[in-house]
Amino acid sequence: MNLVVIGVNHKTAPVALRERLAFVGGDIQVAQAQLQQITAGSLIISTCNRTEIYALAPSTQLLANSDAALSKQSDLSLADEPVSTVDLTEQLITWLADFKQVPLEETRPYLYDYVDGQALTHMLRVAAGLDSMILGEPQIFGQIKRSVNQAKEQGFLTNQLNWVVEQIFAAAKRVRNETDVGTQAISLGYAASKLVTQIFDRPEETTFLLIAAGEMNRLVAQNIAGLGVKRILICNRTPERANLLAQELAHLGIQIEVHPLTELDSLLYQADIVSSCSGSMDMLIDKAMTRRALKKRRYKPMLMVDLAVPRDIDSSVGKLDDVYLYSIDDLQHVIAGNLEKRRQAAVEAELLVSHLVVEIERRFQVRKVGQDIHDYRALAAQKAEAVLNEALHELRTSEATAEEVMTELTRRLTQTLVHAPSSLMRRAARDGNNEAIDLIILGLKDAYRKK
């Protein structure tokens, strides 16, 4: 297959090095253009937790002079021999260090590299969330898809690498659909969003009230906003941070309002979902306030998530009918149980990954043989045409009879047809490979028998 991957991730490299090796902005386009010169297709995946380069080694390799291997200004020449995956791996490692201007000796100890089946396995594990910091998280799949789409738009994803990527995407979906590795919530934000879908049949019709615009509530907001809620109310002591969060969520096309914390009492009745994490020493929502809100909203159910320590919402609020109150401890208990379930599911997922990689390799071999047969037929037709042209020329210019020319044509075509298998059998005989000789002879006999 000639597939190579090199990279660093959160398990192999400290964040300081990952930052230096990350691709941002227009970096990827420039990098992909350079990689085109030494690969048969490449793909760069760069997130906060990993930087990886996937590439195919070409059968005929463009090489540059040794002191500027990938410079566009270098004089390029065709190599006589195919480039091995070992050679390409070394080229990619050297290129990455040069491109990011990080000394090779500082980079190499933290890099991992895989080829062919191991590279496929790694790529599938990454896409399925099995290699993520948060086991089974789905975000990496979307990040890879965006990288693939970008490479396609820029013309850097070759047909062969695109085929590999499509196989990986289909396999990753099977891993997530056929195992429970991604079904259990193991982050506070994701756990909160799961509660929303359990309580509300139509999250897109709900209003979400966010009390405080700190980091934890920001993560909750991202997850719940991703459900497509109709409206978000951000209630914060100061408008600056609330406005920043509003801008961050604005691209989702959701109606967003920013209010001062002093308006909380008058806003509460509008909220179907409440997430609070203020860091205040005072209780923000008590039982009486919630009763007023419930009455005003005609006792439609409310989900309240209190992530604050000390708590923002009086625990007695949870005793009210139509209120579902969850504290940070409640969510942590859910997450702990779910993490163990994910770990158990990951064992099953890893077995499925191994099976799917074998399937992909088999499909690749079938695809490759099909291309090899096509190329062989084209070469045979080219040789036959050359022999035919010689015969036609002889008919026009020599005194030979048509029968003599046809006899010579038949002889030459026969030599052309038997040359390749004869050479293979001689080579196999020299190598003592009797199995290959038997396979060739039996195959030829079977083919001629069918004719």
From Swiss-Prot:
This is Glutamyl-tRNA reductase. The active site is at 48 (nucleophile). SUPFAM superfamilies: Glutamyl tRNA-reductase catalytic, N-terminal domain, Glutamyl tRNA-reductase dimerization domain, NAD(P)-binding Rossmann-fold domains. Belongs to the glutamyl-tRNA reductase family. NADP(+) binds at residues 212-217. GO terms for biological process: protoporphyrinogen IX biosynthetic process from glutamate. HAMAP family: Glu_tRNA_reductase (MF_00087). The keyword Oxidoreductase applies. Keywords: NADP, Oxidoreductase, Porphyrin biosynthesis. During catalysis, the active site Cys acts as a nucleophile attacking the alpha-carbonyl group of tRNA-bound glutamate with the formation of a thioester intermediate between enzyme and glutamate, and the concomitant release of tRNA(Glu). The thioester intermediate is finally reduced by direct hydride transfer from NADPH, to form the product GSA. NCBIfam families: hemA. Catalyzes the NADPH-dependent reduction of glutamyl-tRNA(Glu) to glutamate 1-semialdehyde (GSA). It holds the Pfam family Shikimate_DH. The gene is hemA. Homodimer. It comes from Psychrobacter sp. (strain PRwf-1). Pathway: Porphyrin-containing compound metabolism; protoporphyrin-IX biosynthesis; 5-aminolevulinate from L-glutamyl-tRNA(Glu): step 1/2.
